[in-house]
Amino acid sequence: MGTATAQPALRPQTSTVIGGLHGAAVLDNTGRTVIDVTDFGADPSGKADSAAAVSAAMAHAKTVGGPTTLHFPTGTYHIWPERTPKRELYVSNTVGSDQAFRTKNIGILVEDMRDVVVDGGGSRIVNHGFQTVFAAIRSSDVRFTNFSQTWVAPKTVDITVADAGVVSGQAYRIIDIPETYDYAVEGTSVRWNGERGPATGQPYWTGTNSFDYSQVHDPATNRTWRTSNPVFPERHEDHRPRRRQVRITYGDSTAPGDRGYVYQMREVTRDTPGALFWESSRVTVDHLRLGYLHGFGIVGQLSEDIGIDSVTFKADRGSGRVTSGFADHIQMSGVKGTVRITNSVFDNPQDDPINIHGTYLQATAAERETLQLRYMHNETSGFPQFYPGDTIELVDKRTMLAAPGATAKVVSVTGPTGSGVPAGTDPDTYLRTMTVVLDRTLPAAVLAAPGDYVAENTTYTPTVEITGNTFQAVPTRGILVTTRRPVRIENNRFDGMSMASIYISSDARSWYESGPVRNVTIRGNVFDRPASPVIFFDPTNQDFVAGQPVHRNVLIEDNDFNLTGGTILSGRGVGGLTFRDNRVERYPHLRLTGPSRALRVGDTTTVTTDAPPPSHTSPLFTFDGADDITLANNTYGNGFNKRVNTANMDVSEITVTADGLALNADSISSAPVAVSYSSSRPKVATVDSEGVVKALSGGTTSITARATIGGVRVTSNPVKVVVATER
């Protein structure tokens, strides 16, 4: 839709409360000018493209003095990329200097504005093609609130194994394909086609079989993990049993065991962020439901004070899809002030839900007070890392410690600006390198061997508060955070993380994500069935310096660790760490697995559970190059190895109080789990104490298992057993 020719009426309003999205969002429009996007042609019926109308409404808002609310009357608004604002932008952890993706399409763009509320009014935003859903660029006091969002045809393809088995000696799968995807069976391949653009009629993207990357979600256990994709190795597509199904047969006779699994597939180019805050301050996102973010997640970059509250990152299960994000959900790269993430749900991303870090730049040359620096990771470049007046710190890559005398103020910077490449320059060189002039001469060690050092902007390091959130069905880590300012991770629930729930690195070897932590509190969280280790300090230093850990001042208290085995805490290069008043138990859960096919009278089969073994042998704690560690007044259930392993440190650095832990020696207790079984209709089939089911007569029965785990009496999921009367 085009811009309205007449100026729409300005609508001063008072307070409103709009509910329905993660509680109620309170909007105080007193003294604000409210601009209605439908006055500019936006279509709340969802029939027309509203991109140009939304852009026109925002352009008008820029001409209005004072606080402004851009309002979407309740409805469904489709936004196609062709008529959105375009900007050349370079974004952390995406495509680096690749010129093929330098131009971003932005659905809702707040640019060079102040005191703006984007109020969705409870509406649904439907995105098409490749675009950033919303962005704030060089703006302040911006709020995005009160809408849900989804994608018509995400570039992540989710397929469900509807059935699997063996027929005539050949294994097969039948896969369900959601309505949103266009596909074609081409010989022995499946070709996937994205939605077709209105201008070209061509699909926005195409792919074959399992693309470049795959992970799998098990709805029965609500777990997601990275894995190779077994659906599309050598095989033959036979026919379509039903609409939007493909039957795939294989050359072997091993029955697939993945009925019900959802395979999530994509290629790996992070061409655009899902949302972006660039050189902006006091940006708030609240009361949203984000069904899918293409390319990457919400990125804060060289910005200040960002708040995310009551946001649900979760796909609409009615769509047949489960993936809610192409990669991370939230990435804060070089942010100052406070990053506050509260009361939100993170479900089924393709990478880490939260990653908060700075960026280490490699020093390549040094002369007196001048440094040459370079972005090292291919996914990050093109934007400035320093402004005049910022503080720079040089870090020795071998120790990951600040170099003595190498902290200075920035006087001037020559390098990428984040928004373009000067004519006649090589894009890769220009976008990846910069020259920084400091207010003092560099130390002799840096001048002699600049390649041994990396640089961090310590001005753009935030205070972090992550509280009241839920992390579930995550294939990676839950929270990554590296900032020297206070970090509080409190009252969150982590369920079934596939890697460390909390990961603290400081990396000058791979991703070059900075820096050290100096004040971390992890309190009141629940870690259910976590991966090992649950909390992981893992800086990339090659050498340890006694008494100078990379990370320090960490308090971990009053948390519940409900384990299926493994290590609670692995601390490398960390000091001044206290682990106290925590509770460690076995995860009280029992899952029962049974036959996938009907039995015949007289048949027997065995049902199995995931009951834990009598004891776990992994040490509960490991420390490497650590110092001043206190483990005190924690409680431990039976069945664990209450062992503390140490390396590259003196054992006297570990203080144990009332925990009964053993240093570098096993301390294993046993807690055998007795499982009992029952059949709801024993006349149809019986089950004995070993889980052996015997079919007696035609009909259906349910088998259930029970056990006491971690002091809690638990009942398994029921397994249906069907007994046929004829052989």
UniProtKB/Swiss-Prot annotation:
PbH1 repeats lie at residues 336-358, 461-483, 484-506, 517-538, 551-572, 574-603. Specifically cleaves the branched blood group B antigen at neutral pH with low consumption of recombinant enzyme. It is therefore a good candidate to participate in the development of universal red blood cells by removing blood group B antigen. Its EC number is 3.2.1.n1, 3.2.1.22. GO terms for molecular function: alpha-galactosidase activity. Keywords: Glycosidase, Hydrolase, Repeat. Residues 221-230 have a biased composition (Polar residues). It holds the Pfam family Beta-barrel_GLAA-B_II. It catalyses: Hydrolysis of terminal, non-reducing branched (1->3)-alpha-D-galactosidic residues, producing free D-galactose; Hydrolysis of terminal, non-reducing alpha-D-galactose residues in alpha-D-galactosides, including galactose oligosaccharides, galactomannans and galactolipids. Residues 220-241 are annotated as: Disordered. Belongs to the glycosyl hydrolase 110 family. A subfamily. Alpha-galactosidase that specifically removes branched alpha-1,3-linked galactose residues present in blood group B antigens. Has no activity toward linear alpha-1,3-linked galactose residues. This is Alpha-1,3-galactosidase A. It comes from Peterkaempfera griseoplana. The gene is glaA.
